[in-house]
């Protein structure tokens, strides 16, 4: 038994080391991708974040907030891969596969663990101005702890770059493009994101209103549902409020959350979040097809138990909030 446990532990250590080495090799192959922060030297100040290992939406908030704050403070963004196996495993599963250009913006280091020495957005606040908190901080290295960094304000200064980074993996882009036929690619696409918490009856009323508006403006409208629950999709597609509009219908049920985000970046002209605090849905809206793509979300007060961020910090001001009283 002792030998078997030791062999299992050895195998896991070898696996983790292999992942770290692979990340370092891949990132080293793309030195031109990290010119945003200049060449790193030991004299430059660095910043590390205590990163989320949750779903892809949480990971994006954490990583991109790290990058945005680093740029604001003129510090090098560092991810320490040593003694951080859970984070490395998480990044390897989705970020490394689908969004490698985002990881290429970081310096991936193997160094002794760094203790948390700063906090940002902790006390019931999604956003705190990093300049106000850290601009006079002369420490060579900051290790920042937060509450998930769920605010676009941390990284909105990088939005144009982020929109490019999510499209830089050619294989992922091709996979997303091929989810629909060539004849459907020029349709005007309304993308609806749903979760287990989505209210079917409220959602169908809102979708009907959205369809009523856009089918009067565009001839070829396509309704796309991004939900892992076939019951929700079936309810929407077969409902009489929806069927009266002439639209093509498509489900992304077989696509991973990260693939749905890439699909939204390529195709979604309109995004509707039926559960406003879903970080996966949020990124579908933030990275929709165009800078001026319309994003709608239900009033967060409909979901008091799901509140994870301040509304003013979480939702960009251009997004449109839909009332619970929608008819």
From Swiss-Prot:
Membrane topology: Single-pass membrane protein
Gene Ontology biological-process annotations: innate immune response; macromolecule glycosylation
InterPro entries: Alpha-1-2_FucT
Tagged with keyword Repressor: no
Superkingdom classification of source: Eukaryota
Localization annotation: Membrane
Recorded GO CC terms: membrane
Transmembrane annotation, as ranges: 13-33
Entry keywords, A to Z: Membrane, Transmembrane, Transmembrane helix
Primary location: membrane
Keyword Transmembrane helix part of the UniProt annotation: yes
PANTHER family: PROTEIN CBG02648, UNCHARACTERIZED GLYCOSOL TRANSFERASE-RELATED
Protein name: Uncharacterized protein T25D10.1
Organism ancestry: Eukaryota, Metazoa, Ecdysozoa, Nematoda, Chromadorea
